[in-house]
Amino acid sequence: MDALKSAGRAIIRSPSIAKQSWGGGKHKKLPENWTDTRETLLEGMLFHLKYLGMTLVEQPKGEELSATAVKRIVATAKASGKKLQKVLLKVSPRGIILYDSASNQLIENVSIYRISYCTADKMHDKVFAYIAQSQQNETLECHAFLCTKRKMAQAVTLTVAQAFKVAFEFWQVSRENKDKREKSGSDGEGASSSQSDGSSSITSLKASASANLLDFEDCTKAFDVLNASDNHIEDLFRQNSTNENNNIVWELDDGLDEAFARLAESRTNPQVLDIGLTANDLQSEECLSPTSWDKLELNPAEADELFMF
């Protein structure tokens, strides 16, 4: 079974994803079964890409919309004649964090709640792109990245979609707790009861985590290729050494909460991030192979085909 096809079905069919505690630690390899490691996605999955650029768009989602935006970005990148910037893209339920590969300097941190669409472009099939609402002026921006191969662009897209499902569950809990606090008002007893209810619900969600992260039947097959015998895989999934993500209760500011609610209204299904991938797109004899994801340099022959995607 094609790995990407299985992963795609899992994103569509998987049950509600329970909340987990955020962890840190040293680098480590993935286990034989990726679905056994809850922290893998929660702590962030890393992808080595090349940044093509950004352009403004008028709508939060749409295949034709994103295709036009990507075409414009690629044309601008070609015209500039500049070497593409190598970047490290970290995907987690908190969002997309972009680092410069050479300096490790933070370029951008986009909350998952501001992302309205992502896709592996049809025309330029090595390009991954996402649309997000700007934090500064609330305009909609389409950002595009060049991957080493088409399967990698699809893998990044599916990873962002899966991260969104986790984030949506966090958002629901945050909203529920916020509503309880508002109802309890300034009454001490009410506040205590609200806190107890919140803790109880989170404990219950954590208890069911191992069973609900992904659809086991499909995703066990989909991620069998991500196993500890692959010497390259540990370089792709580096855990954050800080404890910045240890708190599983996310407090959203009113602006972000409103932005997410507004973007949710534009989705086909508010609980699922719209992606420009279909079952037909994922049908291929080529399996998702992470061994080439960490390929940073193009050989001379490939360099001439930099924009021939």
UniProtKB/Swiss-Prot annotation:
Subcellular location: Cytoplasm
Region AP-2 complex binding: start-end pairs: 250-277
Biased composition regions of type Low complexity, renumbered to the chain: 189-201
Pfam families from the UniProt entry: PID (PF00640)
Residues covered by the PID domain: 41-195
Subunit structure: Interacts (via PID domain) with ldlr (via NPXY motif). Binds to soluble clathrin trimers and to the adapter protein complex 2 (AP-2, beta 2 subunit). Binds to phosphoinositides, which regulate clathrin bud assembly at the cell surface. Interacts with the VLDL receptor (vldlr). Interacts with the vitellogenin receptor.
Protein name per UniProt: Low density lipoprotein receptor adapter protein 1-B
